[in-house]
Curated annotation (Swiss-Prot):
Organism of provenance: Burkholderia vietnamiensis (strain G4 / LMG 22486)
Pfam families named in the record: LpxC
EC number: 3.5.1.108
Protein name as it appears in the record: UDP-3-O-acyl-N-acetylglucosamine deacetylase
Gene designation per UniProt: lpxC
Function: Catalyzes the hydrolysis of UDP-3-O-myristoyl-N-acetylglucosamine to form UDP-3-O-myristoylglucosamine and acetate, the committed step in lipid A biosynthesis.
Length: 305
């Protein structure tokens, strides 16, 4: 059977929160089959466990924020994206603040951390959410949509009227049957505009933001000396975010995702719409890994590249 996965050993790292600018300690721990991804605020007098789920996402203005019993864990999307990309089903994520550290602004640090811990298959079938009917959410000209598809592919279109973004492409389509998440998506960094960063800082946000963890643009160009990691890094980062946003549903999706100018809020609304229609999806497992869609049965020791 195609099995669930967790990590082999405990791994730790330290970083800063993008918005708070505060130091955050992050610990990843193995979890039993069927646990899911569970975030734990270990800094609180009584630690609060917040399982990743579509219904636990609260604030989505600047990041995906999980909330429960007054506790929050913000900016979960890059770590969730890494878990999706490496097929991690079960994991405990201990944090000492209300924000996951931003690291280098991409998912690469989390991929490296998970691969350093080692990936372990578990004796339980991996459960997928197979989309059986189209589901769509619209907000003005923005939209996000899931269609039935035997695998996982995404098509994302952004619309940033900026010369540097225009030059690198505003649209990307990826089918993970023949694309490596680690090589092609994981290293794409978050980006922002210098004037917005200044405004956010005045509001007490983006205190941890810098060119070490984001691509920063002025009105005309990229300000980072080292340029881009991918020719189309902007749209690739939006896709990285979407993969993480969608993975909070609790299982990998078997679906085709199409989006135009979507963000954390629309992605979460799409998941809620899907879950509201019981005839739009089913939970499936694969007794024979060979019968599963290509791309899900990759080697657990994929080299970081």
């Amino acid at each position: 059977m195609l099995k669930q996965r967790t990590i082999k050993s405990i791994v730790k790292t330290v970083g800063i929160g993008l918005h708070s600018g505060r130091k955050v300690e992050l610990t990843l721990r193995p979890a039993a089959p069927g646990t899911g991804i569970v975030f734990s605020r270990v800094d609180l007098p009584t630690p609060v466990d917040i399982p990743a789920s579509a219904m636990s996402i609260g604030d989505t203005r600047l990041a995906s924020v999980l909330q429960k019993d007054g506790a929050r864990v913000s900016t979960v999307e890059h770590l969730m994206s890494a878990c999706a990309g490496l097929g991690i089903d079960n994991l405990y994520v201990d944090v000492t603040a209300e924000e996951i550290p931003i690291m280098d602004g991409s998912a690469a640090s989390f991929v490296f951390l998970i691969q350093s811990a080692g990936i372990e298959e578990q004796n339980a079938p991996k459960r997928f959410i197979k989309v059986t009917k189209p589901v769509e959410i619209r907000d003005g000209d923005k939209f996000a949509r899931l269609d039935p598809f035997f695998g996982f592919k995404l098509k994302f279109t952004i619309d940033f009227r900026h010369p540097a973004v225009d030059k690198t492409g505003q649209e990307l389509e990826v089918d993970f049957a023949n694309t490596s998440y680690v090589r092609e998506i994981a290293r794409a960094r978050t980006f922002g505009f210098a004037h917005e960063v200044e405004m956010m800082r005045e509001l007490g946000l983006a205190r941890g933001g810098s060119m070490d963890n984001a691509i920063v643009l002025d009105e005309y160009r990229i300000l980072n000396n080292d340029g881009l990691r991918y020719d189309d890094e902007f749209v690739k980062h939006k896709m990285l975010d979407a993969i993480g946003d969608l993975y909070v549903v609790g299982h990998p999706l078997l679906a085709s995702y199409t989006a135009y100018k979507s963000g954390h809020g629309l992605n979460n609304a799409l998941l809620r719409e899907l879950l509201a229609h019981e005839d739009a999806y089913e939970i499936v497992t694969f007794d024979d890994p060979q019968s599963a869609p290509k791309g899900f049965a990759f080697d657990t020791q994929t080299a970081f590249a």
